[in-house]
């Protein structure tokens, strides 16, 4: 709490939190900000700061996650004690009228057994306090609250604070796009500090990340080098609706930081380069740089690690090569990554003599593949994963040659599919160029046989997406689909009774055979593992990207329609190939009709209906992402959305409220779903009667309902066959590429 009344000189006792183990780094950072009386604590530091100093901490810290102003504390022996302790705080004097709030509750004990209960009791105390004072009841806002209250229950003692930072300070606000496994921004800053980047930058050294992803290390490196306050790109802070906030003082702190940024960007120059083999993430990195106005400061290029070398257009002052390579979760991935680490280290040794080389990895065993001796090691956490930063000094070429390692052996023997070109750079062979084993030859031959069988259908129907293999050989259990010239492999996870190493080896064989048979280079192979999931779990993301991203998609032609397909981020791609015949049937029958698509996914059937001449359509799904995807599918085909609506809703709720009539309905629900977004659990075997019956209630006379399910044990209820005219059209809705898997789905045509 404050110790003086004058706002400009009032000292606030604050707790500035950070990741465990960073306390020393954070203490040094705050002392450099001229914040006095800094004392290290557990996962943070205690400081005494003026209002202006508090603003500077929020704006300038590269390491902290929260800035908390402690308010009160008390013992918790019963659930009601939470309300009692929180009620001791004079909330009306702390929160501006009308401010929304959120309570972050951490910790439990015998009286408070879950954090939701604790948060609710604190919230009740805040609301009661404000209402008793005659104030307006504050709204609870989970995403972007005006005021965040931090409640921590530790050793039966509840500590209440107001969160002056708001959203976690690692969220700088510049991340427009991201790759598959982005580093948190404050973690990237901590890695750079531990690697010695500030000193290297002061000496004019360069910064280079050969596997830069969406550019977090590069951006944080630039912010450090140019002394740019990381908080300048944030839209909102937690203190803005705190009554102690002084807008004039805050504006001055911000303006001072902007002046420093502008001056340094004009007067200083640093060489900062980032490369990545993934074209899409380099575009994401460029967008993130542009968000900060650093597009002319940070240079991004699409380049694999095998081609890593210093820029040829200028001589760089030796600096820092820092990298966060993949660490691998599967045996095959780890084995492949050993080669990646070897190549990375080889290129650094060849090209960056006299530089500092830093490798951050969650698999320290892979770091050994560099065959370098670390000057220092620092332990970190990357999310929940233990990780380590290895910092090396790159020896001269002569010194490096004194140490023989297996890297050289790999180059000479070409056993692992690598070759060394005339310039000494390493080039990794594509999987499709490597010699086939006997087992991989069998797989390749089976796929070639399937391609030959499908050739006529592909040509006649102009297929651009089709299945070429579906666990044809039981020991090689996967589905392989071809989209244009890109290959999508979904491995069916092996039963627990199968030895994991054996299953892994079989899958590597399958992948090799597929790559050769389809002549697909590595950058056109996309591999997923399909596990036994419930409901729409198959739709879950494989990466951390957010929403629909056209740059990560390709266009696939289906009849007259162009459809977006994403091979990278989800287990399924946005286009269920087995439903192709049903979509084409809907296309033919939709002319002049009103079409309803329930559980619409990416609304590909709705696009076909619209292009087939449907007068109107309604597509219903609960997922914002898939409705955004559907919107883009419509726009790709120049379909106006005024008459083709996309509705985000629970399909059961929507059906119960629907008073419209439709001529053509597609019902393709998941087998099971217990999504929190749904009002009830969906089990298609149990719920088929009420779901189909409700659809028939809104089906116009002479209309058709197409009901489809992927549940292999599904049995159509006799009530449906008795009430309506039902025709099993499953066989007619399975094309040649799925004939080997006739139970891929069942489909019925249902009419009055």
UniProtKB/Swiss-Prot annotation:
InterPro entries: 23SrRNA_methyltr_KL, RlmKL-like_Mtase, RlmKL-like_Mtase_CS, RlmL_1st, SAM-dep_methyl-trfase, SAM-dependent_MTases_sf, THUMP_dom. It comes from the Bacteria. Its EC number is 2.1.1.173, 2.1.1.264. GO terms for cellular component: cytoplasm. It is found in: Cytoplasm. GO terms for molecular function: 23S rRNA (guanine(2445)-N(2))-methyltransferase activity; RNA binding; rRNA (guanine-N7-)-methyltransferase activity. Pfam families: Methyltrans_SAM, RlmL_1st, THUMP, UPF0020. It is an enzyme of class 2 (transferase). It catalyses: guanosine(2445) in 23S rRNA + S-adenosyl-L-methionine = N(2)-methylguanosine(2445) in 23S rRNA + S-adenosyl-L-homocysteine + H(+); guanosine(2069) in 23S rRNA + S-adenosyl-L-methionine = N(2)-methylguanosine(2069) in 23S rRNA + S-adenosyl-L-homocysteine + H(+). Keywords: Cytoplasm, Methyltransferase, RNA-binding, rRNA processing, S-adenosyl-L-methionine, Transferase. NCBIfam families: PRK11783.1. HAMAP family: 23SrRNA_methyltr_KL. This is Ribosomal RNA large subunit methyltransferase K/L. It comes from Saccharophagus degradans (strain 2-40 / ATCC 43961 / DSM 17024).
């Amino acid at each position: 709490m404050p110790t003086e009344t004058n706002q400009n000189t009032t000292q606030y006792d604050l707790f500035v939190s950070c990741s465990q183990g960073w306390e020393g780094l954070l203490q040094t950072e705050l002392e450099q900000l001229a914040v006095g009386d800094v004392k290290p604590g557990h996962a943070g530091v205690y400081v005494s700061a003026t209002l202006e100093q508090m603003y500077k901490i929020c704006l300038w810290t590269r390491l902290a996650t929260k800035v908390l102003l402690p308010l009160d504390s008390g013992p918790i022996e019963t659930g009601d004690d939470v309300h009692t302790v929180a009620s001791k705080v004079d909330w009306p004097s702390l929160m501006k009228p009308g401010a929304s709030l959120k309570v972050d509750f951490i910790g439990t004990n015998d009286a408070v057994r879950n954090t939701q209960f604790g948060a609710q009791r604190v919230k009740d105390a805040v609301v009661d306090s404000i209402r008793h004072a005659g104030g307006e009841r504050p709204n609870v806002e989970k995403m972007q609250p005006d005021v965040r209250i931090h409640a921590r229950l530790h050793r039966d003692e509840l500590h209440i604070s107001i969160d002056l930072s708001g959203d976690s300070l690692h969220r700088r606000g510049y991340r427009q796009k991201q790759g598959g496994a982005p580093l948190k921004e404050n973690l990237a800053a901590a890695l750079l500090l531990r690697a010695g980047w500030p000193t290297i930058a002061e000496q004019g050294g360069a910064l280079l990340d050969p596997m830069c992803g969406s550019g977090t290390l590069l951006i944080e490196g630039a912010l450090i080098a140019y002394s740019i306050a990381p908080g300048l790109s944030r839209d909102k802070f937690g203190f803005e609706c705190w009554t102690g906030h002084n807008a004039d003082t805050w504006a001055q702190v911000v303006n001072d930081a902007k002046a420093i940024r502008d001056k340094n960007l004009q007067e200083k120059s640093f060489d900062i380069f980032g490369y990545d083999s993934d074209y899409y993430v380099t575009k994401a990195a460029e967008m993130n740089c542009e968000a900060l106005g650093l597009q002319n400061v940070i240079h991004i290029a699409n380049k694999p690690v095998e081609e890593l070398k210093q820029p040829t257009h200028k001589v760089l002052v030796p600096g820092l090569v820092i990298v966060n390579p993949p660490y691998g979760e599967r045996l095959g991935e780890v084995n492949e990554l050993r080669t990646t680490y070897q190549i990375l280290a080889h290129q650094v040794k060849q090209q960056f003599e006299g530089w500092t080389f830093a490798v951050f990895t969650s698999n320290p065993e892979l770091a050994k593949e560099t065959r370098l001796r670390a000057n220092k090691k620092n332990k970190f956490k990357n999310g929940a994963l233990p990780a380590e930063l290895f910092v090396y000094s790159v020896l001269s070429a002569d010194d490096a040659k004194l140490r023989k390692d297996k890297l050289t052996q790999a180059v000479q023997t070409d056993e692992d599919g690598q070759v060394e070109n005339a310039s000494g750079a390493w080039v990794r062979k594509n999987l499709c160029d490597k010699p086939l084993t006997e087992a991989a030859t069998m797989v390749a031959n089976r796929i070639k046989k399937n391609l030959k069988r499908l050739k006529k259908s592909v040509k006649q129907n102009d297929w651009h997406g089709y299945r070429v293999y579906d666990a044809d050989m039981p020991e090689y259990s996967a589905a392989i689909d071809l989209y244009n010239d890109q290959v999508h492999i979904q491995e069916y996870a092996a039963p627990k009774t199968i030895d994991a190493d054996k299953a892994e080896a079989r899958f590597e064989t399958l992948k090799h055979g597929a790559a050769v048979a389809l002549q697909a280079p590595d950058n056109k192979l996309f591999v997923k593992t399909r596990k036994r999931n419930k409901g729409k779990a198959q739709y879950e993301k494989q990466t951390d990207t957010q929403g629909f991203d056209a740059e990560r998609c390709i266009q696939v032609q289906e009849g007259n329609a162009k459809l977006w397909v994403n091979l990278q981020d989800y287990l399924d791609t946005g286009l269920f190939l087995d439903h192709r015949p049903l979509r084409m049937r809907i296309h033919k029958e939709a002319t002049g009709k009103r079409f309803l698509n329930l559980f619409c996914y990416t609304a590909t059937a709705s696009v076909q209906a619209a292009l087939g001449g449907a007068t109107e359509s309604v597509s219903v799904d609960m997922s914002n992402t898939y409705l955004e995807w559907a919107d883009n599918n419509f726009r790709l085909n120049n379909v106006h959305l005024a008459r083709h609506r996309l509705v985000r809703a629970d399909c059961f709720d929507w059906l119960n409220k629907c008073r419209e009539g439709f001529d053509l309905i597609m019902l393709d629900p998941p087998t099971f779903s217990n999504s929190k977004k749904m009002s009830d659990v969906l089990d298609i075997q149990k719920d088929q009667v009420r779901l189909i019956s409700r659809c028939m209630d809104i089906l116009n006379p002479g209309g058709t309902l197409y009901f489809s399910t992927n549940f292999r044990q599904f049995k159509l209820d006799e009530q449906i066959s008795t009430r309506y005219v039902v025709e099993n059209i499953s066989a007619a809705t399975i094309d040649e590429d799925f004939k080997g898997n006739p139970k891929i789905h069942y489909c019925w045509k249902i009419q009055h």
